[in-house]
């Protein structure tokens, strides 16, 4: 809304064109296409729009810090991409002349050859030396105009110029004076330029859309929250203060949750805030220094204009506070008229029909308001905030065409309120404005900020019987007019809680219906989600006896054939390493060394993917064997060789089984010569590649996916766009890393690891250790410089990642990727909370579609669309923290628990769950979700008949303890069960496969070192014997309770069985005997 405050669209931040050799350059392809459009338009509309001009003279004034819009600057930016201040351009039928400084001429050199080759136009540079007035160069241009005109048979030359732009600066004043004395005829070409700029190309349309997105995001995410905060807390805020706050949000888009580069955005005009009876709907309006007024019958008008790549957008809204009936009626009529005007912006219609559509609505619904309606319904918008010639009024008969953009602005000026209780609010105005794009079909609204009555009208009055005000108005005298409760302190909280309860009740009804439908259609019932074991090839070390090596009679390790040769009864007997469960060695006081080998027997498979040891269960198996020797060196060497070989074979078999379950994906299409792939360098990857020495790599965005690679040929990962379920960009704020994270639909292999989450990150701070040893002062210059360098490095890395993410987002907007619905999501830190999703505390942050924790490994990514309900457990008075159980729609999936969430985060989490339409319950105890879900899937009809999930809604009744355990002694996970024999043994072997190398060795030494049967096996035998005799002793109950403590905080939902093998094989009884 700037008319007198016209704003120059400057591409370089300094407002001057870039110098040769720097990062700025002219887009030659863009120049050719638009120069061709200029000449074609000039030729086609020479008589009616260009005044039959033989030449077009465009003089751009020097740069200015004032916010202004000029046709000459607009032509510069439209044609060349930048504004060229203090420059003269002259277009003739066969030549383009530039009169400018040397630096500008060197930048313009790149257009000479393409213009001649493709447009048959000669580009001629007239370089003005410093200190010269340029008169000689101007005479040369005049001669060229006359020569070309004589060649066409014209004696008199007509020169088109922009009549409204007065000359500024010495060069332009000299030019104007000499041009007038050159005996040319002059015509105004403003209409021709306006019509040329009216229809946008695809690049311009995208810039207008991004500008509109920024404008309405600032309105929605900055303006409205600040207004509500000021009203809610009864703050004294001036219009100018709100203007400054809003302007900063436009110039720093991240404050409005918009991912646009700050250097590409600007304001169209200083944001406008008006209230208190003083309103001006003209584009030149300004925010004054008076306080924002929000008394009853108050009107607040807010207008925001934003630019992206110099293209403008606008949005304006009116907010009503305890509106009177007249104000409500006037707004409803204005809203209908505004929507009618937008709907009338159809290709082929005349512009005056748009204004007539709005006027007809007012005449029909409120004829008394007709004389108060603004005389214009807006203007065209683009490089200029107000494109002359495209005013939406009753006289403009120009025809609408696709890809025209309009600022549809309509209002009522100086209406009078029937209530005279407040003279300040007696007069009021209303205004609505939106940026709209004309298309081949219906118009496209670009500023999608709500303007419905329910979203802009605020009511703070209590019912008539409760009309005693709780608080006096800030500006009231002896009378009390305001009784606000909808956004005021205690009453506001109660109202908000009631609304949330109502919404949760509706969600409960919907969720029960949805669950009933899903269970009714689920024929699988309580099927097991675990995959069946895969049988690999038979474990055979040697096909016949002749293949065995002939060595001396001692324990040997044949690495090539993966066999261990044991001397038994005078012969070497081969055992495949896959048959060995553990090996250990120790030494007694007599220097005798013992090597003890325990083999796999039926019921304890080599790994979870192999079932060979389940074959021939009726045969006799060797359980364990021990050897004694005096050679300690050989003993330790053999033990280590067997462990190493077993570990290698185990890893290979595990990787082979994992790869067999992978989903086949398409090939990555590398970027060819058409475009250079987007690239981020010096990144680290998680999960990392195997190997001791890690090296950074490069992430590239190709035609259909990403490729991460290092200098090592075997370290390469391809992530296809089609396999990405969620993409996240998390800049470093309070963390040490900036990251890009991809959560995938199907697993991929990263080195030898199978994963659904791949992350690429950079550490934003270098670890520096001072060798001086002394403590530095807080004001030490070196310390300050170092901190500044760290801040600069962090900001640069964040900017690089942000640029990469934005470029990829633009790529994902292409039609071929539209079905994937991909966009980099950014975590919302203000909604985050601390909790323990795995083993350590982490900061968990919601995004628009997920709940994530991307810093600590293992990562947490939960899709909100997959959540059935959330149960908040151990919620009660006096508790410092509580637990959050997330139940998924797939009941075969283990429940995810986030433990030890601070109680201070409870209200925020409940509010977030409610706003994302997730049903939540609260309970005082932890529930046994494995048993609950098993009961539901076993008998879904009973679950539905009993009211579905409403069994959780027991208001803290202790009857919940049917599936729970007491938690008054502090947190103990209640869903850890005493596992059956088969589960115990399976998880035992699984933990061996999935644990790290060091953990595995420790586990073997601690759990298998001095026993044949494990302690679990011995205890189970004793327990079974007791059960056969009908005995269940108190000590057994005590052992169960202690065993759960021994498991620590592991849960079936996260670890698949809980604990490592060393924990499983060390029950309380063993600790007690030690």
UniProtKB/Swiss-Prot annotation:
The keyword Transferase does not apply. Residues 505-520, 1010-1032 have a biased composition (Basic and acidic residues). One of its GO terms (cellular component) is nucleus. Widely expressed. Present in embryos, shoots and roots, whereas it is not present in terminally differentiated cells such as mature trichoblasts or cells of the root cap (at protein level). Residues 493-520, 637-658, 782-802 form a coiled coil. Keywords: Chromosome, Coiled coil, DNA damage, DNA repair, DNA replication, Nucleus, Transcription, Transcription regulation. It is found in: Nucleus; Chromosome. InterPro entries: Creatin/AminoP/Spt16_N, Creatinase/aminopeptidase-like, FACT-SPT16_Nlobe, Fact-SPT16_PH, FACT_SPT16_C, FACT_SPT16_M, Pept_M24, PH-like_dom_sf. Residues 955-964 have a biased composition (Low complexity). The keyword DNA damage applies. Component of the FACT complex, a stable heterodimer of SPT16 and SSRP. Belongs to the peptidase M24 family. SPT16 subfamily. This is FACT complex subunit SPT16. It comes from Arabidopsis thaliana (Mouse-ear cress).
């Amino acid at each position: 809304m700037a008319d007198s405050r016209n704003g120059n669209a400057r591409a370089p931040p300094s407002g001057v064109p870039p110098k040769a050799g720097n990062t700025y350059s002219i887009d030659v392809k863009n120049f050719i296409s638009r120069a061709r459009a200029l000449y074609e338009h000039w030729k086609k509309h020479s008589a009616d729009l260009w005044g039959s001009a033989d030449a077009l003279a465009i003089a751009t004034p020097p740069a200015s810090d004032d916010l202004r819009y000029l046709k000459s600057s607009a032509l510069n930016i439209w044609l060349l991409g930048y504004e060229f201040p203090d420059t003269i351009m002259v277009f003739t039928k066969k030549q383009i002349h530039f009169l400018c400084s040397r630096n500008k001429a060197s930048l313009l050199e790149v257009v000479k050859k393409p213009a001649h080759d493709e447009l048959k136009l000669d580009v001629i540079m007239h370089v003005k030396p410093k200190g010269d007035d340029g008169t000689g160069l101007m005479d040369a241009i005049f001669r060229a105009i006359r020569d070309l005109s004589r060649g066409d048979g014209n004696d008199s030359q007509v020169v088109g110029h922009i009549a409204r732009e007065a000359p500024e600066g010495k060069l332009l004043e000299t030019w104007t004076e000499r041009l007038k004395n050159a005996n040319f005829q002059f015509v105004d070409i403003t209409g021709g330029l306006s019509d040329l700029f009216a229809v946008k190309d695809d690049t311009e349309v995208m810039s207008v859309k991004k500008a509109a997105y920024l404008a309405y995001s600032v309105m929605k995410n900055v303006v409205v929250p600040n207004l509500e905060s000021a009203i809610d807390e009864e703050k004294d805020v001036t219009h100018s203060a709100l203007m400054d706050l809003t302007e900063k949000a436009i110039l720093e888009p991240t404050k409005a949750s918009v991912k646009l580069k700050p250097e590409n955005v600007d304001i169209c005009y200083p944001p406008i805030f008006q209230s208190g009876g003083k309103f001006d709907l003209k584009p030149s309006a300004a925010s004054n220094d008076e306080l924002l007024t929000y008394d009853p019958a108050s009107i607040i008008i807010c207008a925001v204009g934003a630019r992206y790549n110099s293209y403008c957008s606008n949005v304006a809204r009116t907010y009503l506070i305890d509106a009177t009936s007249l104000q409500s009626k006037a707004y409803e009529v204005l809203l209908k008229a505004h929507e009618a005007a937008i709907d009338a912006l159809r290709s082929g219609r005349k512009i005056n029909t748009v204004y007539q559509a709005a006027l007809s609505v007012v005449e029909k619904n409120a004829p008394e308001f007709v004389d108060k309606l603004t005389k214009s319904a807006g203007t065209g918008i683009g490089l200029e905030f107000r494109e002359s010639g495209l005013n939406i009024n009753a006289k403009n008969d120009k025809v609408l065409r696709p890809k025209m953009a309009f600022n549809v602005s309509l209002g009522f000026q100086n209406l009078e309120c029937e209530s005279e209780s407040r003279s300040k609010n007696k007069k009021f105005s209303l205004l609505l404005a939106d940026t709209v794009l004309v298309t081949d079909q219906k118009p496209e609204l670009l500023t999608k900020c709500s303007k419905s009555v329910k979203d802009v009208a605020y009511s703070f009055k209590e019912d008539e019987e409760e009309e005693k005000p709780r608080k006096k108005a800030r500006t009231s005298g002896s009378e009390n007019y305001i009784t606000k409760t909808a956004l005021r302190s205690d009453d506001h909280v109660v109202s908000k809680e009631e609304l949330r309860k109502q919404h949760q009740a509706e969600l409960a009804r919907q969720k029960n219906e949805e669950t009933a439908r899903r269970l009714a259609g689920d024929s699988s019932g309580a099927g097991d989600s675990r995959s069946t074991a895969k049988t690999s090839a038979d474990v055979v070390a040697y096909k016949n006896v002749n293949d065995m090596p002939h060595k001396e009679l001692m324990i040997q390790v044949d690495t090539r054939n993966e066999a261990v040769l044991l001397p038994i009864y005078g012969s070497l007997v081969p055992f495949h390493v896959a048959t060995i469960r553990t090996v250990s060695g120790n030494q007694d006081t007599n220097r005798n060394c013992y090597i003890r080998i325990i083999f796999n027997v039926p019921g304890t498979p080599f790994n979870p993917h192999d079932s060979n040891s389940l074959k021939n269960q009726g045969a006799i198996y060797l359980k364990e064997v021990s050897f004694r020797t005096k050679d300690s060196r050989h003993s330790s060497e053999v033990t280590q060789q067997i462990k190493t070989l077993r570990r290698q074979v185990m890893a290979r078999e595990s990787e082979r089984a994992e790869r067999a379950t992978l989903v086949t994906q398409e090939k990555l299409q590398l970027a060819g010569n058409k475009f250079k792939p987007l690239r981020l360098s010096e990144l680290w990857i998680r999960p990392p590649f195997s190997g001791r020495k890690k090296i950074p790599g490069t992430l590239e965005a190709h035609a259909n996916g990403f490729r991460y690679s290092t200098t090592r040929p075997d370290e390469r990962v391809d992530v296809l766009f089609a396999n990405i379920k969620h993409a996240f960009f998390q800049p470093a704020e309070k963390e040490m890393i900036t990251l890009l994270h991809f959560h995938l639909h199907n697993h991929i292999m990263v080195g030898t690891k199978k994963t659904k989450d791949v992350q690429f990150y950079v550490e934003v701070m270098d670890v520096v250790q001072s060798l001086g040893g002394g403590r530095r002062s807080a004001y030490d210059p070196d310390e300050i410089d170092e901190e500044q360098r760290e801040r600069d490095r962090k900001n640069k890395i964040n900017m690089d990642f942000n640029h990469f993410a934005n470029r990829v987002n633009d790529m994902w907007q292409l039609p071929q990727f539209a079905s994937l619905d991909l966009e980099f999501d950014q975590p919302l830190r203000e909604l985050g909370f601390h909790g323990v999703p795995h083993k350590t505390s982490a900061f968990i942050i919601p995004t628009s579609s997920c709940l994530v924790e991307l810093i600590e490994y293992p990562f947490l990514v939960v899709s909100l669309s997959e959540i059935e309900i959330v149960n908040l457990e151990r919620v009660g008075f006096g508790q410092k923290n509580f637990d959050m159980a997330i139940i998924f729609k797939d009941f075969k999936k283990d429940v995810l628990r986030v433990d030890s969430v601070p109680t201070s985060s409870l209200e925020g989490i409940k509010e977030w769950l409610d706003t994302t339409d997730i049903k939540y319950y609260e309970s005082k105890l932890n529930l046994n979700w494995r048993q609950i879900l098993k009961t539901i899937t076993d008998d879904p009809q009973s679950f539905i008949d009993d009211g579905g999930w409403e069994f959780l809604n027991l208001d803290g009744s202790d009857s919940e303890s049917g599936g729970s355990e007491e938690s008054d002694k502090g947190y103990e996970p209640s869903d850890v069960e005493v596992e059956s024999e088969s589960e115990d043994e399976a998880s035992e072997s699984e933990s061996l496969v999935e644990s790290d190398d060091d953990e595995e060795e420790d586990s073997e030494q601690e759990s298998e070192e001095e026993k044949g049967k494990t302690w679990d096996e011995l205890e189970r035998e004793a327990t079974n014997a007791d059960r056969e005799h009908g005995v269940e002793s108190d000590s057994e109950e005590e052992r169960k309770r202690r065993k759960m403590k021994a498991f620590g905080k592991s849960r079936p939902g996260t670890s698949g069985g809980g604990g490592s093998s060393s924990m499983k094989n060390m029950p309380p009884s063993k600790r007690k005997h030690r």
